[in-house]
Amino acid sequence: MGVLEAIWWLAVGHVVSDFVLQPEFMANAKHPDSECQREKYGPWWLWMGGHGIMNGAVTALILGVWWVGPIEAAHHALTDWAKCKGHVGFWEDQVSHALMKGLLLWIVIN
């Protein structure tokens, strides 16, 4: 797979894993300060971790290298946690995800 094709698939994978496969209840359930969601769906870290792992798995599958999965999962979950806590906004969150995917691609191809 060429670089442009990898960028394309990373973007598609991000849209699918960060939006399509994250329904509204998951976006709410992964929020650390959402007491009502905790009673309904369980601990926030379970949903945040699951969402991060899903993003990491998609990235690892696209790049074909297993070790990018845990790195992407941790980064994705930490960035989303920062967004939930109000430390970064939506666009900073999305740019951070894109930059990490770009960095991982650069490391893999070099």
Task: Give, region by region, the residue ranges found by the protein language model.
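Transmembrane helix interruption/hinge and helix-loop junction motifs
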Residues: 1-5, 59-69, 108-110
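Interhelical loop and helix-boundary elements at the membrane-water interface
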Residues: 9-55, 73, 77-108
